[in-house]
């Protein structure tokens, strides 16, 4: 979920922190990409409704491959435009997120029931919509994605915890230019630059500058974290009756959630005295202090400890994996890699050989140095028959 309605709030209250840019603007830049978020998007984008069934891209064993198609094409798109992607995967979710994960699991189960009902009724568009809501990423899918990206020569990082937090750390350390994710909580983790909107080829990309945002909001970082918690985040329930606009007004007046809670208590007491319903409802378990701590001191590997290096694609093993094991069309792999190799270098370094060094490093969450604190439908790259009907 990220931060509820934060994008719209910032458009209204801090419009000057936004820029809309086309992809080629980022030529020569290194960008940290939220791999888990991208995989969800690609899996959904490669699903379609048949006459009586939902169709998905799969390998010969029925394993979903839409995420691989998307990651392959997106990586080629980046490289072809002179962008150096660093793919960052989620590690173990924080305990505070367990409630949100349980909520999502329940919603997926409900969506599965609705999918089956819609299929029985022949409502294929509704069936597709509900099926998309059941999308999950298995450990095997994650391992396949990491294997493919390594073979393509890209740096891959497995974060100790949240991918957005690790990207923000890399960005603050100067290792990458920006964090690319749809999750707005990358700003809560203090990424200096956030990029959103890579899902379409023709539409511009939103660039959000953290310092410009804070200058317009005229609040401290700690107050911004409290604002995000009040808007609604993944780590705790929110106070009912307080939306982004009200949260901002209250933060400006009372400075912190503690001050706001005192205000809420007074307002509700006054309304109770007048035999009125409470204006605000504070959840029984309002874990704002723990949430605040998680945002301010997340579990990440220090940026200065991470060395980002690129390698030339291992074409032989990449084709063996994608063509023989995952059912991709060999011609698609060849044509994609040729596009990059032939890219003109005028104005920016975009040839494959200018990008890739000697090694690609994988940073694991159990590393002893890890310390706490598309778009149009993706072009089908698989052979005919690589689809799964539901």
Curated annotation (Swiss-Prot):
The lineage of its organism: Eukaryota, Sar, Alveolata, Ciliophora, Intramacronucleata. One of its GO terms (biological process) is DNA replication, removal of RNA primer. Residues 348-356 are annotated as: Interaction with PCNA. Mg(2+) 2 binds at residues 183, 185, 234. Its EC number is 3.1.-.-. DNA binds at residues 74, 162, 232, 234. Phosphorylated. Phosphorylation upon DNA damage induces relocalization to the nuclear plasma. Belongs to the XPG/RAD2 endonuclease family. FEN1 subfamily. Residues 1-108 are annotated as: N-domain. InterPro entries: 5-3_exonuclease_C_sf (IPR036279), Flap_endonuc (IPR023426), HhH2 (IPR008918), PIN-like_dom_sf (IPR029060), XPG-I_dom (IPR006086), XPG/Rad2 (IPR006084), XPG_DNA_repair_N (IPR006085). Its cofactor is Mg(2+). Its main location: nucleus. Gene3D superfamilies: 5' to 3' exonuclease, C-terminal subdomain (1.10.150.20), 5'-nuclease (3.40.50.1010). Mg(2+) 1 binds at residues 34, 90, 162, 164. Keywords: DNA damage, DNA repair, DNA replication, Endonuclease, Exonuclease, Hydrolase, Magnesium, Metal-binding, Mitochondrion, Nuclease, Nucleus, Phosphoprotein. It is found in: Nucleus, Nucleolus; Nucleus, Nucleoplasm; Mitochondrion. It comes from the Eukaryota. It is an enzyme of class 3 (hydrolase). GO terms for cellular component: mitochondrion; nucleolus; nucleoplasm. Residues 126-254 are annotated as: I-domain. This is Flap endonuclease 1-1. Structure-specific nuclease with 5'-flap endonuclease and 5'-3' exonuclease activities involved in DNA replication and repair. During DNA replication, cleaves the 5'-overhanging flap structure that is generated by displacement synthesis when DNA polymerase encounters the 5'-end of a downstream Okazaki fragment. It enters the flap from the 5'-end and then tracks to cleave the flap base, leaving a nick for ligation. Also involved in the long patch base excision repair (LP-BER) pathway, by cleaving within the apurinic/apyrimidinic (AP) site-terminated flap. GO terms for molecular function: 5'-3' exonuclease activity; 5'-flap endonuclease activity; DNA binding; magnesium ion binding. Binds 2 magnesium ions per subunit. They probably participate in the reaction catalyzed by the enzyme. May bind an additional third magnesium ion after substrate binding. Residues 359-390 are annotated as: Disordered. Interacts with PCNA. Three molecules of FEN1 bind to one PCNA trimer with each molecule binding to one PCNA monomer. PCNA stimulates the nuclease activity without altering cleavage specificity. It comes from Paramecium tetraurelia.
